[in-house]
Amino acid sequence: SLIKISTEIIEDSYDETQDVFNLLDLAESKLYDITQGNIKKSTETAQSLVIQAKKKIEEISNKDGLSGVPSGFSDLDKLTSGWQPSDLIIIASRPGMGKTALTLSMARYMTVAKNIPVAFFSLEMSSIQLITRLISSETGLSSEKLRTGNLEKFEWEQLNVKVSSLENAPLYIDDTPSLSIFDLRAKARRLSSQYGIKLIVIDYLQLMTAGGSNKNGNREQEISTISRNLKALSKELNVPVIALSQLSRAVETRGGSKRPILSDLRESGAIEQDADIVTFIYRPEYYKIDEWDDEERTPSSGQAEFIVAKHRNGGLNNIRLKFVSSLGKFENIDNYDSPFEFQSKINQEGPKVNPDQAFESGSYREEGEDMPF
């Protein structure tokens, strides 16, 4: 198989009509398939697929738990049964709503509480900034205290004790700026092969480039290439891919509650089409709206709504969450000290991680920081 694949790569390399970035991506994909033992027939019989589907259904029904990767948010996990393998999930909002904070809350739960390996590609913030946010969430010390280093003796002790679980978490952060979709796919394959990654986060989609394959196209075509490749990556690695996305300014100009809708997605056509799940983060408090637009007119202070606007394989819902701005994290609105009552089917053992390699450091990038507070 290796000789056959190598011959195909060499033959394609002589074809001057081939785009070099597409060729590199195709070559790495074929070599990755060999290392993973994925060389198989391109088609399967209905009988074989039915047997596989029945086996999966039986595995889920015979155990009390989720079939996917748990987010840590109870109502969301009940709706989705966890983030499913091969799904592309879009989490979108206007700047300042807390996209990064929400996904960090999920990543913290997956890696610290459930020992599920997660890859986090941060194109906006440096890896040190992300880790500082996680330390704030884990220790209960405000981001302001951590930024200034103005800690009391007992707070230093609190920091040293509580950060140990974070040090050993199977979380892998890459903060390469202006990452191309082909570079991201190559990095994701290596992380999957080396660490058994079960979920990938990209923060955020509009900061990516399509590489050389779309150099003459417009931005909408470039976003289309990126979203299509992210969906292909989720299927290739058989893991959920969560891509954060910005919303257009149309949300700000609209009257009423300013709750986002699907058409608010930037370059929305391709993103909406490729995604299996499209969600929005909405905080009325951000717009100085002090109560929810429901019958009870309950106060909206310190609360957010996680809107599942598209769900290819399930239902839709608007899920209320608690937002702790001082710590930059989201929690279940009820009983958030015990965020999740089920057990995920995802293999939680994962590879053993060297604490010195668990986090990749990077340079600070202060501009354009998507801070929710």
Residue ranges of model-derived segments:
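Cytosolic-facing regulatory segments adjacent to core modules
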Residues: K78, Y109-G196, A210, I319, ...
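Flexible beta-alpha connector loops of hexameric P-loop NTPases
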Residues: S143-E152, Y172-S178, T209-S224, V251-S263
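Walker B catalytic acidic pair
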Residues: Y204
